[in-house]
């Protein structure tokens, strides 16, 4: 996953350092978004023109804007599938023995350091940090699914 993101960033690198167009091209630019002009600014007389001038971005630059809302919404089944996928990739876990109720130490034969590595992998997968106090309590995949669903406000 990280290598794909890095490759995509490196491919876009030459475009990021391309010279910006000169002023006549900026005059032909279209507004990027109305979210750049909040409601309060739009109501003030004379402020709309200056806000629109700031909101105009050349067309060659607009394709570099990143869209964070492109990710699909999380569901409990999606979280469970991602947790099990990450665990199946872990070399010390036998995929045949793995289920959502498998205890890391009792059923899968892992130790505390393996559990820490699993929690770190989950942090990387879901993009947020799990405090050590909470991480010590997560001893099976279902507990990890429940914890992530609680933190990301995912309910059925």
Curated annotation (Swiss-Prot):
UniProt GO MF annotations: mitochondrial large ribosomal subunit binding; structural molecule activity
Sequence positions bearing N6-acetyllysine: 88
One Pfam assignment: PP-binding
Residues that bear O-(pantetheine 4'-phosphoryl)serine: 112
Keywords per UniProt: Acetylation, Electron transport, Fatty acid biosynthesis, Fatty acid metabolism, Lipid biosynthesis, Lipid metabolism, Mitochondrion, Phosphopantetheine, Phosphoprotein, Respiratory chain, Transit peptide, Transport
Signal peptide (from-to): none
Record domain Carrier: where: 77-152
GO annotations of cellular component type: iron-sulfur cluster assembly complex; mitochondrial [2Fe-2S] assembly complex; mitochondrial inner membrane; mitochondrion; nucleoplasm; respiratory chain complex I
GO biological process, one term: iron-sulfur cluster assembly
PROSITE patterns assigned: CARRIER, PHOSPHOPANTETHEINE
PTMs per UniProt: Phosphopantetheinylation at Ser-112 is essential for interactions with LYR motif-containing proteins.
Main location: mitochondrion
Subunit structure and binding partners: Mammalian complex I is composed of 45 different subunits. Interacts with ETFRF1. Identified in a complex composed of MALSU1, MIEF1 upstream open reading frame protein and NDUFAB1; within the trimeric complex, MIEF1 upstream open reading frame protein functions as a bridging scaffold that interacts with MALSU1 on one side, and with NDUFAB1 on the other side. The complex interacts with the mitochondrial large ribosomal subunit. Interacts with alpha-1-microglobulin chain; this interaction is required for the maintenance of mitochondrial redox homeostasis.
Annotated HAMAP family: Acyl_carrier
Family designation: Belongs to the acyl carrier protein (ACP) family.
Function comment: Carrier of the growing fatty acid chain in fatty acid biosynthesis. Accessory and non-catalytic subunit of the mitochondrial membrane respiratory chain NADH dehydrogenase (Complex I), which functions in the transfer of electrons from NADH to the respiratory chain. Accessory protein, of the core iron-sulfur cluster (ISC) assembly complex, that regulates, in association with LYRM4, the stability and the cysteine desulfurase activity of NFS1 and participates in the [2Fe-2S] clusters assembly on the scaffolding protein ISCU.
Protein name, per record: Acyl carrier protein, mitochondrial
């Amino acid at each position: 996953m990280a290598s794909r993101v890095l490759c995509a960033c490196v491919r876009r690198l030459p475009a990021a350092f391309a010279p910006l167009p000169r002023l006549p091209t900026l005059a032909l630019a279209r507004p990027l978004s109305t979210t750049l002009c909040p409601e309060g600014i739009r109501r003030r007389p004379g402020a709309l023109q200056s806000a629109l001038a700031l909101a105009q971005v050349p067309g060659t630059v607009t394709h570099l804007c990143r869209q964070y809302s492109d990710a699909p919404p999380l569901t409990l089944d999606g979280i469970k599938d991602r947790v099990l996928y990450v665990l199946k990739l872990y070399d010390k876990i036998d995929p045949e023995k793995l289920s959502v109720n498998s205890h890391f130490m009792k059923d899968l034969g892992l130790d505390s350091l393996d559990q820490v590595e699993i929690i770190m992998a989950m942090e990387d997968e879901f993009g947020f940090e799990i405090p050590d106090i909470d991480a010590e309590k997560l001893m099976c995949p279902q507990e990890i699914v429940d914890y992530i669903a609680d933190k990301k406000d995912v309910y059925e």
